[in-house]
Design a protein with these regions (language model features):
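Extreme N-terminal, non-catalytic leader segments
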Residues: 1-18, 23, 55, 139, ...
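Short solvent-exposed loop/turn micro-motifs enriched in small/polar/acidic residues
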Residues: 4-6, 45, 102-103
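Short, acidic/polar N-cap/turn motifs at the starts of alpha helices
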Residues: 10-12, 49, 107
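Glycine-rich phosphate-binding P-loop
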Residues: 14-38
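Conserved NTP phosphate-binding and transfer environment spanning the P-loop NTPase/kinase superfamily
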Residues: 85-151
């Protein structure tokens, strides 16, 4: 297990103990979606840059010290929010345009630091995007099931 930190351009929030990594290009809506998730009860881990390290339970996300607790709220400013020190990443949300998402997508994984993590595409500015992130996490944690899943 390497103690090497990899810093990426992303945002990370936590729902309970589950870290959710929001990835996408500049101005794709990472901070905006994080703000709405925080409003729905999530906790900020890191905005704009996320430090990732391989830990005993998987990929652990944290904020660089200079950015701890800070979230950019476009047209308002950089604001201080309550935050968690770190969280293990349970879900990676790739922020894309709505037309890039299949109506009934196949579930995929993405590899980060040699660990395969569940990966979904999210259109961040859709009204339902916060709920979709919560539902995707529920599928991963087993708190909800797909209609065709009989297990």
């Amino acid at each position: 297990m390497s103690n090497e930190i990899k810093q990426i351009h992303a945002t990370c929030i936590a729902i309970g103990d589950n870290g959710i990594l929001l990835r996408g290009p500049t101005a794709s809506g990472k901070s905006d979606l994080a703000l709405r998730l925080i409003d729905a009860g999530a906790t900020l881990i890191a905005d704009d840059r996320v430090d990732l390290i391989l830990g005993s339970k998987g990929v652990c996300a944290s904020a660089p010290a200079i950015l701890k607790g800070l979230l950019e709220v476009r047209n308002i400013g950089i604001l201080q929010f309550p935050s968690k020190e770190n969280a293990f990443v349970s879900l990676v949300c790739e922020l894309v345009r709505p037309e890039e998402i299949e109506r009934m997508p196949q579930y995929t994984n993405t590899c980060i630091l040699g660990i395969n993590l569940p990966h979904v595409l999210i259109a961040p500015f859709e009204t339902s995007s916060v709920t979709k992130v919560q539902l995707a996490l529920g599928l991963i944690t087993g708190s909800i099931k797909l209609a065709h899943d009989k297990s």
